[in-house]
């Protein structure tokens, strides 16, 4: 389910919210500069509260354009559509797996990875929302959810592990469109816009730290597997 929903919203490419889900995203007004803001969360809005907690977003903040905005909005759509059909534990898992697909994140100042930090937030939400949780069950749940989340995140960026240059380029070429909205206008963008997009891609790939591409948690995948993917 997380794989199906994690790219439902892509504001830059779509020029806003997709029409089929626009009614589910009324909590995000635009500032005059076009940025999106998370409104105050109603106490009875379980789906939005869960997404904000898992993504560590706060009411009133501007959603970060390149650090989880589209993943967060996609998670909100998923949570609102699925909340009446999934258990709380499964809903937490879906939102957490979508959060894990935010790419290219470094360790924080304390040396914690994105999956380490996500695990703490998942554990907190599971303990708060699942009344019969006991410590051993909670840790087993967290380990499974974050391992699954890391697996999904790694599949999402699997093109970076291709050893064949042609396969690598065909897999990563989509990033040019994703990070350069003008190119979404087929036949309209200029040569200058195309050149700028190519140069951005060159700079991005040249500066990307391989250690920030693939994720792991609780030795899944193993250190050796991650090293092989990043080689």
Predicted ranges, named:
Residues 58-61, 73:
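N-terminal, non-catalytic alpha-helical interaction modules of very large eukaryotic scaffold proteins
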Residues 67-84:
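An active-site-proximal "capping" alpha-helix that borders the catalytic cofactor pocket
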Residues 1-57, 64:
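Acidic/His-rich, divalent-metal-binding segments that scaffold phosphate/diphosphate chemistry
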Residues 5, 9-16, 20-21, 79-91, ...:
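Divalent metal-dependent phosphate-bond-processing catalytic cores, especially two-metal-ion Mg2+/Mn2+ enzymes
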């Amino acid at each position: 389910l997380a794989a199906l929903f994690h790219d439902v919203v892509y504001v830059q490419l779509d020029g806003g919210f997709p029409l089929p889900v626009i009614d589910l995203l009324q909590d995000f007004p635009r500032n005059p500069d076009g940025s999106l803001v998370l409104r105050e969360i109603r106490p009875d809005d379980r789906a939005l509260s869960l997404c904000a907690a898992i993504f560590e977003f706060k009411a009133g903040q501007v959603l970060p354009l390149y650090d989880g905005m589209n993943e967060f909005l996609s998670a909100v759509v998923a949570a609102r559509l699925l909340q009446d059909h999934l258990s709380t534990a499964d809903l937490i898992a879906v939102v957490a797996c979508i959060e894990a697909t935010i790419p290219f994140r470094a360790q924080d100042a304390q040396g914690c990875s994105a999956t380490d930090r996500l695990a703490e937030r998942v554990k907190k939400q599971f303990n708060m929302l699942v009344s019969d949780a006991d410590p051993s069950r909670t840790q087993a749940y967290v380990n499974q959810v974050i391992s699954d989340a890391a697996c999904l995140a790694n599949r999402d960026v699997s093109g970076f592990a291709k050893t064949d240059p042609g396969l690598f380029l065909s897999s990563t070429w989509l990033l040019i469109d994703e990070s350069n909205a003008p190119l979404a206008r087929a036949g309209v963008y200029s040569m200058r816009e195309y050149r700028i997009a190519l140069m951005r891609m060159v700079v991005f790939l040249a500066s990307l730290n391989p250690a920030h591409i693939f994720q792991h948690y609780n030795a899944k995948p193993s250190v050796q597997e991650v090293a092989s993917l990043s080689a």
